[in-house]
Amino acid sequence: MVHEQFTGTSPLPDTWDLLQGDHLGQPMLVRLNTGAADLAGRGSHDIRVGVAVPFNAPRPDGLPELVEGDALEDFEDELVDLVGGRGTLVAVITTGGVREFVLYTGEEWWIHQFQRDLASAIPSHRVQVSAKPDPDWCVYRSFGP
């Protein structure tokens, strides 16, 4: 959830949709934070942060095994805690042996430390973090809202 001090608005609703499809012939699961739609394109959160975690032992269909999936759920909780009020998690995309967490933020000063902290949060996996301007929320909007 995004905090009032960060957005200048009331806290956003914590509502998520589950979408299913395929990407390059493999199943794709997307959890989409529909409560964040009001922030899209408003200008306060124009930096997209992608956090990609490749699976160590994906199933043949590219999805995680149960044990690895559980570890990634714990990682997601840690990720949300580390972001705090600096941004909001808008999507979690699972496909092709990777889980990607998509966030939007208005500031990037904290991202380098965030990347180091994430690597410590799941030392059994490689964590890749990227940040790019995305004032139109292209990734988020590609899933429909």
Task: State where each predicted segment sits.
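Short amphipathic alpha-helical segments
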Residues: 49, 99-101
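Helix N-cap motif at beta-to-alpha junctions
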Residues: 104-112
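Charge-rich, low-complexity segments
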Residues: 1-77, 84-90, 108-109, 142-144
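A short beta-turn/loop motif at secondary-structure boundaries
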Residues: 92-97
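Generic non-transmembrane alpha-helical segments
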Residues: 78-85, 113-121
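Conserved short beta-strand edge segments in small beta-sheet-based binding/regulatory domains
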Residues: 120-145
